[in-house]
Regions:
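N-terminal chloroplast transit peptides
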Residues: 2-11
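A glycine-rich beta-to-alpha transition motif near the start of alpha/beta enzyme domains, typified by
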Residues: 12, 16-191, 198-361
Length: 361
């Protein structure tokens, strides 16, 4: 049966290759699919045009304005889904960086992403883009929010886990009181961890962070996100193009025995992070530190709504413009789930993807 199986696979492969070469596709996009603590990252490695730009911020704008169909095709149905997440690999624009990375979701682009950085760094070492050294291989990623240093822990040639050193994070606006339609008054903190987050203690809404409440938490998160962007102006003091609260992090009591806090991060068009969220963990640690609740080098274990964990700690204090800031490190695991050739058929009316959910939020 082994022989016949090999014969069948060989036969299929030969005929498929012959057939495929006769097909005419608009694009063949190669991706490496991964997940970090349950949250996907579909990493685009080839099949898209060169992305010009003197900075990663400019490259992100070019993608948004000229190549947005790539993002929608690979993130949305039928190839992706409402909660899909991705990373587009580009040439870096700073000499030290190994790779440039721009993060994508169903709704648009993100300037920074912890789980995605862990996924990209894992793939860079597992697939030999960066030469593996044991016990530690450094991969330097350039993102639109700055340089992210990934320390990839390698054992017997395999990646065990990744510690990323994120961009300086800071509490931006503490104690914001907001009147949110159909929710009433909500108290929140605005904190930066690579993106701007609204941090919300879910207990004030009488809600627990648990899978059964996912839909309701997403609904509440999007309402808060919309209200915050209507009422509060935010602007990163150094990176002027970061000027919106992109994510809402609702937090509560943990269920994992090692965790200090449990959260759900809501973003995009009502997407929920399955991982504890690296930039969200950074933003939360910055807020805790500013309020005297987390010391430098003290471990902070963060649990996701799916029950997976990231381990975080703050390694130094610094400044960002007029803000006191901290440098966070996040440790987590990513695994490769697939090597994909995604094709865009010129005759397919849905070739650029579709979403059912966009209209409801």
């Amino acid at each position: 049966s082994m022989l016949s199986r090999r014969f069948i696979i060989g036969f299929l492969r030969e005929n498929l290759v012959r057939k495929v070469s006769r097909l005419r596709f608009d694009r063949v996009i190669s991706t490496v699919d991964t997940h970090t603590a349950g949250e996907p990252t579909r990493i685009v490695v080839s099949g898209i045009p060169r992305i010009p730009g003197k900075t990663l911020g400019e490259k992100m704008e070019y993608l948004r304005n000229e190549l947005d169909f790539v993002r929608s095709a690979i993130m949305r149905e039928p190839r992706g889904h409402n909660d899909m997440f991705g990373a587009i690999i580009t040439e870096p624009t700073t000499p030290d960086a190994d790779l440039g990375v721009i993060f994508t979701d169903c709704g648009g682009y993100l300037t920074g992403c912890g789980h995605g950085s862990i996924g990209v760094a894992t793939v860079a070492v597992e697939l030999g883009w960066v030469k593996a050294t044991e016990p530690s291989t450094i991969v330097l990623l350039e993102t639109p929010s700055g340089l992210v240093k990934a320390d990839v822990h390698v054992q017997k040639g395999r990646v065990k886990e990744v510690t990323i050193r994120n961009v300086p994070s800071f509490l931006y606006k503490p104690n914001v009181q907001l009147s949110v339609p159909s929710l009433g008054d909500v108290r929140l903190d605005i904190s930066f961890g690579g993106n701007f987050f609204a941090l919300v203690d879910a207990s004030q809404l009488g809600m627990k962070i648990e899978p059964a409440n996912t839909e309701r938490l997403i609904d509440v998160g999007i309402k808060i996100k919309n209200a915050v962007n209507k009422e509060v102006k935010v602007n990163h003091p150094l990176l002027k193009y970061i000027d919106r609260v992109e994510l809402v992090e609702l937090y509560g009591k943990p269920t994992h025995p090692e965790a200090h806090s449990k959260n759900i991060v809501v973003f995009g068009v009502g997407q929920a992070d399955r991982s504890p969220c690296g930039t969200g963990t950074s933003a939360r640690m910055a807020e805790l530190h500013a309020n005297g609740k987390l010391k430098l080098e003290e471990e902070f274990v963060h649990e996701s709504i799916a029950g997976t964990i990231f381990r975080g700690r703050l390694v130094e204090e610094t400044r960002v413009g007029r803000f006191k800031a901290v440098v966070p490190e996040i440790t987590g695991n990513a695994y490769i789930t697939g090597l994909n050739q995604l094709v865009l058929d010129p005759d397919d009316p849905l070739k650029h993807g579709f979403l059912l959910k966009a209209s409801s939020h």
